[in-house]
Curated annotation (Swiss-Prot):
Keyword Protein biosynthesis part of the UniProt annotation: yes
KW Cytoplasm (keyword) present: yes
Domain of life: Bacteria
Localisation: Cytoplasm
Gene that this polypeptide is encoded by: frr
Full protein name: Ribosome-recycling factor
Entry's Gene Ontology BP terms: translation; translational termination
Protein family membership: Belongs to the RRF family.
Organism: Gloeobacter violaceus (strain ATCC 29082 / PCC 7421)
Amino acid sequence: MNVSKTEQDMRKAIEATAGNFATIRTGRASTSLLDRINVEYYGQPTPLKTLATITTPDASTVLIQPYDPSSLRLIEKTILESDLGLPPSNDGKTIRLNIPPLTAERRKDLVKVLRNLAEEGRVAVRNIRRHAIDEVRKEEKDAKVSEDEARRLQDEVQKLTDKSIQQIEKLFEAKEKEITTV
């Protein structure tokens, strides 16, 4: 049983959760808002950032300039169908997303989405823990490790799990504060 691999997997789960948090809009324009957007381009789901230049000319605008002008309509349609809640404005060459100030109701909705993303991260960490502990038990059953060593490894995995869940909780609290601050 390799504890460092378990630690690495948990770190990846935390990074994935942080990446998901970055896609939640906070009232300020950010290119990371569009990180999860995949456009159906020639039958393939393609990340928007590979189809267009995405910039933030000011604090309340995201500008999308497609490399291929024919993809403009597809990008616009995908953004409309996404959970961003931002209506795109298409001028024929670029798409603008104007980021309105968040309403109290929208802030509450975003915190709910954030809470769900945090829970997904915690579940991922727990699944990694379960897999690691199953591996330790299998090694103990196969007499590859002693009962004491198995207990020590399980305790170590549990400590990593607690630490990882605590990190996800800190990320959640910081992002929640960012969203709820007017």
